[in-house]
């Protein structure tokens, strides 16, 4: 629901005006409510967050958390067989990074983050934990997150 709120009115969000900011805040509150109901951050935190936390722990200069999660969302959605292009296009519409170069982190480090993210919160199993190296490399290349 939270992502849909932003996606359906991405032009308003991209404008940076109050109406767009309100949409983002509404989406964040919605996400927070889902986490409160579940009693865990799981509804809003999957492989993309484990990817981001790995970068935070292993990069000399990590990027912004949301930007890292955005990149992680592209690859994890690809692995799920979902509409990763919609995520990429939504990020692009707000001038967010959509590949490792734009994120400012080398391809090798980004790929290592996807491959080694299972080290982060190992009790939280995500699509990255269930994917092998070949699948992850294919996803990162097919989505142009690396390459």
Predicted stretch roles:
Residues 81-147:
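C-terminal charged capping/lid subdomain of soluble metabolic enzymes
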Residues 1-95, 101, 105:
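Active-site segments that bind and position negatively charged phosphate/pyrophosphate groups
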């Amino acid at each position: 629901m939270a992502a849909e709120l932003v996606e359906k009115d991405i032009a308003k969000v991209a404008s940076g005006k109050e109406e767009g900011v309100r949409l983002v805040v509404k989406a964040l509150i919605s996400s927070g409510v889902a986490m409160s109901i579940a009693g865990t951050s799981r509804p809003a935190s999957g492989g993309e967050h484990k990817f981001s936390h790995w970068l935070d722990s292993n990069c000399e200069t990590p990027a912004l958390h949301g930007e890292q999660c955005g990149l992680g969302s592209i690859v994890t959605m690809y692995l799920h067989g979902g509409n990763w292009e919609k995520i990429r296009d939504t990020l692009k519409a707000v001038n967010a990074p959509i590949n490792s170069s734009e994120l400012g982190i080398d391809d090798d480090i980004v790929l290592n983050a996807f491959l080694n993210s299972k080290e982060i919160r190992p009790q939280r199993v995500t699509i990255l934990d269930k994917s092998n190296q070949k699948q992850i490399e294919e996803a990162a290349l097919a989505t142009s997150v690396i390459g």
